[in-house]
Amino acid sequence: MGLVNIMRFITFAYIICGGFILTRTSGTSASASPATPTTNTGEGTSSPVTPTYTTSTDSNNSTATNNSTDVNGTEATPTPSHPHSHENTITCTNSLISVPYYTSVTINCSTTVSVNHSEYRLEIHLNQRTPFSDTPPGDQENYVNHNATKDQTLLLFSTAHSSAKSRRVGQLGVIPDRLPKRQLFNLPAHTNGGTNFPLNIKSIDWRTAGVYVWYLFAKNGSLINSTSVTVLTYNAPLMDLSVHPSLKGENHRAVCVVASYFPHNSVKLRWYKNAKEVDFTKYVTNASSVWVDGLITRISTVSIPADPDEEYPPSLRCSIEWYRDEVSFSRMAKAGTPSVFVAPTVSVNVEDGAAVCTAECVPSNGVFVSWVVNDHLPGVPSQDVTTGVCSSHPGLVNMRSSRPLSEENGEREYNCIIEGYPDGLPMFSDSVVYDASPIVEDMPVLTGIIAVTCGAAALALVVLITAVCFYCSKPSQVPYKKADF
């Protein structure tokens, strides 16, 4: 009896211990299982968070659900779906590449799964875009780019397009534009079961800059995974300043040229007069142009009225800020002072068988007289002399130049031109017409002879008339005979 009770007690204790051990084991397993992440919905409750996977992102933050086209306009629409596995991923060595213009770039991307044509399809797309299209840091450029194509998505490569099929769907990896058709990319090889899909871009420019996206699709067309690489390019501007000479009292003018830069809208330009910023809306005009290579050239012209109270011409400075990207920029500036000239007074006369040119208020150095006769440069040298100082403008002088008249018959135009002034100023000149024909030269002598002859004839006529009148005024006498006495 006692033995039976002891056996029952041992059995009961064994059952209790076994249940306790099972309970501890279940609790430990439950505590070790991963909890579902939650997020606050903003209403005091939490909801589970479903893991998401990044697809593609273009300049407008669009995903892989956007339609894309190949070079022939055929739509290729990736179908979004949840990834089949966390391990079926695409990795690239870089997610952002920024290189100088015309640089060759290779993007190395690989998959963790062998892309068998019977199970998967891999595609490479290019989302063309222009940097700073949303919030450009530079000035707005007023030009029309006839070369550029609209931002679009292009299909560059697909493992579903074998060499035999590619002849039917068109050539991939070629961007249509006004330039001659040429291969811009070295595309991956069509290898069944491959894992490496490098893309070589032969030249990064306005056509090939953008977001490149690698898509991995399942056999049924659902999207498994994707990754994107943003490729940016830049080209530093060349700057030149030309300050134009001006006449006293006229506007001061200067032209600033910022050439061959990229990206678009990446240059901020300002003008300064003696370190004071110039009003852009009143005194500055701008023009921009884009060349066939996609680089931009900007021409800015400033024209400021002369201040009569200023003793000296002002300093004009063109300053630019060029933004290579959203965070990197550099400054450049050039300055110059315009040369101000007094307009000379030029006159030409004929004196003593020579054409004489007088120029008043000209610079004492670098200025000379050039003669042109009937639009031809004469072979006869001229004689230039300084006759004195300009009374109205100290520091300037008066000049006199003469040259013999032509001995040829007919009219001749003698044009006196003051040379030596810089380009950009008007031409200072004067002219006179002289006829050297013999009939014209003998006319004064003939006129004198005729005048003397007429005078002598008139005098003789007067004497004759006077004599006749005197004779007629005497009393008449009757003749007599000697016999009458």
Curated annotation (Swiss-Prot):
UniProt-annotated glycosylation sites, renumbered to this chain: N60, N61, N66, N67, N72, N108, N116, N147, N220, N225, N286
Any one GO BP annotation for this protein: adhesion receptor-mediated virion attachment to host cell
Sequence ranges on the Virion surface membrane side: 33-444
Alphabetized UniProt keyword annotations: Disulfide bond, Glycoprotein, Host-virus interaction, Immunoglobulin domain, Inhibition of host complement factors by virus, Membrane, Signal, Transmembrane, Transmembrane helix, Viral attachment to host adhesion receptor, Viral attachment to host cell, Viral immunoevasion, Virion, Virus entry into host cell
Domain Ig-like: 237-330
InterPro entries, sorted: GA_GC, Ig-like_dom, Ig-like_dom_sf
Chain ranges on the Cytoplasmic side, renumbered to this chain: 469-485
Organism domain of life: Viruses
Feature: compositional bias, Low complexity: 28-72
Disulphide bonds in the chain: C92-C109, C256-C318, C357-C416, C361-C390
Ranges for region Disordered: 28-88
Transmembrane segments: 445-468
Topology relative to the membrane: Single-pass membrane protein
Family designation: Belongs to the herpesviridae glycoprotein C family.
Function description: Essential for the initial attachment to heparan sulfate moieties of the host cell surface proteoglycans. Also plays a role in host immune evasion by inhibiting the host complement cascade activation.
Name of the protein in question: Envelope glycoprotein C
Taxonomic classification: Viruses, Duplodnaviria, Heunggongvirae, Peploviricota, Herviviricetes
